[in-house]
Design a protein with these regions (language model features):
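Conserved G1/Walker A P-loop phosphate-binding module
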Residues: 1-93, 97-98
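Canonical P-loop GTPase G-domain recognition
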Residues: 15, 158-204
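Charged, alpha-helix-enriched surfaces in structured cytosolic catalytic cores
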Residues: 24, 50-53, 108, 186-187, ...
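Short, glycine/charged-enriched secondary-structure capping and boundary segments
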Residues: 32-33, 87-90, 138-142, 167-171, ...
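Conserved, well-folded catalytic cores of nucleic-acid-processing
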Residues: 36, 61, 80, 148, ...
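Active-site-proximal flexible loops/turns
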Residues: 38, 83-86, 135, 164-167, ...
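Conserved nucleotide-binding/hydrolysis micro-motifs of P-loop NTPases
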Residues: 51, 79-81, 130-132, 158-162, ...
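Conserved C-terminal guanine-recognition region of P-loop GTPase G domains, centered on the G4
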Residues: 101-176
């Protein structure tokens, strides 16, 4: 395709879903992509667990990499957890009532995120590279993605931190595409963009 035809070609619409454990950096990465390509952020980042308790979207993100133009919708999912304990919120200063309500919202968000997977075209599975990747949550997410034949990328995040262990994540998910990044520093982000474009090109 000539560059003139490429400029005129209509971008492919892609729903890009951000999945992962609580506080793995999903929203930080979604915000990074949103700022890079649309000068907008998707959601609020917080140290309090389950800050994202409902699906958040940023539409009409004009993305281009490796000769591929995409019309992205960034879909930031609530963090997935095997259980939600109100005490985790109380440790961050919330009252008992506030913590209980937040726990209910977080639980609903987890269910919503899994159900919404059918609407996702490509998924980024964000893994905290400073924690063990051998967590049931990660394998639950991957199992759901594979069951629905969704293309995805494993994204070890926080690689700028000294305790990050990229090799361990690669070993844990050796059969899958793995692209390490630092969502805060921007390390590895261009490689991730290329991989997103590559998967999108293979979509029907």
């Amino acid at each position: 395709m000539s560059w003139r035809l490429w400029l005129k070609s209509k971008p492919k619409s892609v729903n890009l879903g951000f999945y992962g454990e609580v506080n793995a950096g999903k929203t930080t990465l979604a915000n990074k992509i949103g700022k890079d390509w649309a000068d907008q952020e998707v959601g609020v980042v917080s140290e309090i667990p389950h800050e994202t308790r409902s699906i958040q979207k940023l539409e009409k993100v004009n993305f281009a990499a490796k000769g591929t133009k995409l019309d992205l919708t960034l879909i930031d999912m609530p963090g997935i957890a095997s259980s939600v304990n109100p005490k985790d919120f109380m440790r961050h200063g919330l009252s008992a009532n506030e913590a209980m309500e937040r726990a209910k919202e977080a639980t609903r968000g987890i269910v919503e995120a899994i159900k919404y997977l059918e609407n996702v075209d490509v998924a980024l599975v964000i893994v905290d590279a400073t924690r063990t990747p051998f967590d049931q949550v990660n394998f639950t997410i991957l199992g759901n993605l594979e069951h629905q034949s969704k293309p995805f990328i494993i994204v070890p995040n926080k690689i700028d931190l000294p305790e990050a262990d990229i090799r361990l994540v690669r070993d844990a998910f050796s059969e899958y595409p793995v692209v390490p990044v630092s969502a805060i520093q921007g390390d590895g982000i261009e490689t991730l963009y290329d991989k997103i474009a590559e998967l999108a090109r293979k979509m029907r």
